[in-house]
């Protein structure tokens, strides 16, 4: 069924299609419509909606639901996601699946309600304590807000891990037609869960191992999961990269601006391509490195002071120059402004290699 939806509403439609049965949350702009929509749709589809007293309460309730084998989720924006970090670390340490949606706003502190991508480090690098990672998927359309939420639930159960969907206020608030899937994804058996019967009485959900050797074993087991994710769960999209001399790397709303800029630049004879990471962790390192060997330079376009660019530089490993085009504080560049920078880069790069 095709519907005109806000990005935030599409998240909940995807969650329902994925078989999510529990939402715990605390409202915060620009993510509040997720809680509002969940409060209606989950009870209508056999689930529960519980408004928490805080974001700390939200993530701890989610820990409990996940321990019982329930597909559960929460959502917030940067200030609330910061408060959840302890609980997310506990979920990772206890190998509990669940989905956390971060609709980013400008920061640090209370910031403002403008569009920004400043939560990249917080989410992608793991803002909580200890040695853990979380898969992170970054949509760039309202359709993907729905589809990647479904995918996030599937990955969460496949690896028994918390998973993020990372978007921004523009994607959360914009409206686009969405094909909403009617068929629910298949939920796997969870023999490890604690459901209050004799069969699961001896199951233990914990992240505390006082013996040093046992804690090291846990971390080694987690690392094996992350290695498998890096082999199997990398997602990206390319646009006009086959003959590109300059490559743009961008995600989320920035990638839409970047694509428009690439189209304009191509029409003016500038050979530009776009790589859009869809999975921010695991990052498309291998493919980016391959493309870096074919282009003169790379532009990273992001709405932060420079966070994505660190992963790009790591992937490229000095093969080609990497430059940053950024806006912060809720400001966004136009496609035309990006084109002007791309023309400068092409002129400088081709001149250097002439």
Regions found by a protein language model. Give the residues of each.
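Conserved thiamine diphosphate
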Residues: 115-168
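Peripheral docking tails and interdomain loops at the edges
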Residues: 302-354
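Glycine-/acidic-rich phosphate or pyrophosphate-binding loops and their flanking alpha/beta elements
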Residues: 6-10, 223-246, 259
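Conformationally flexible catalytic loops at phosphate/diphosphate-handling active centers
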Residues: 160-238
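Glycine-rich beta-alpha junction loops
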Residues: 105-107, 167-174, 252-254, 305, ...
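Generic long, charged, amphipathic alpha-helical segments
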Residues: 258-291
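Thiamine diphosphate
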Residues: 1-126, 133, 141, 320-321, ...
